[in-house]
Amino acid sequence: LKQFLFIFVPLFLVIAIQFLATYFAMGLSLLIENGWYSATGSAGFLDIVDDTFSLWSSQHFNTGVLLIYNAMSIAVFGLWYYCRYGGNYRPALRQTFHPAAIAGIVMLMPGTQYLTTYIMSFVAALFPHWMDAYESLLETAGLDDQISILMVVCSVIFAPFCEELVFRGVTMHQAKKCLPFWAANLLQALLFGIFHMNMIQGIYAFCLGLVLG
């Protein structure tokens, strides 16, 4: 039972790191704002509060939080995966660049993309308010038409690497200690979907997690 319950620890830990990164960035920005206005004496308390809340809702702030969160998560789960599960970060060149492996990836990824797109479109048609909530979340996170290059780097490179360490790395290896492969893969994909905390993205993440597992 202890081994099974330990499967859920990475999910709770990565969520805790998200909150820690957010509160750290909020506290640091508040300290800087107060220090700046105290030094210049150019604004009152309400102006400071208004500027601070505007900063917290900006794309630059969200990008900073994402950078801090990814750095912390990669450090924590990278060490966890390496030390506890003997993770190897050196690619096996013969297996990685084997023609069969490359062909499988070329066929698998577009197929997975089409499948998840159809599933998401079907779900969005049944529950349009889920799609509205998802689009609102993307705008709040800065993933809209005005997205910055740094946010693209965080979202396309750092975030997937972090998520692979958490779910296909630590969670999957822990799950395989007490469950057969199919059950371990199903559970890590389910936790991967839950981690995204919205239905549309969660369904997409669940389907993708099954394939990556």
Give residue ranges: language-model regions:
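Transmembrane helix-loop-helix hairpins at the membrane interface
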Residues: 148-213
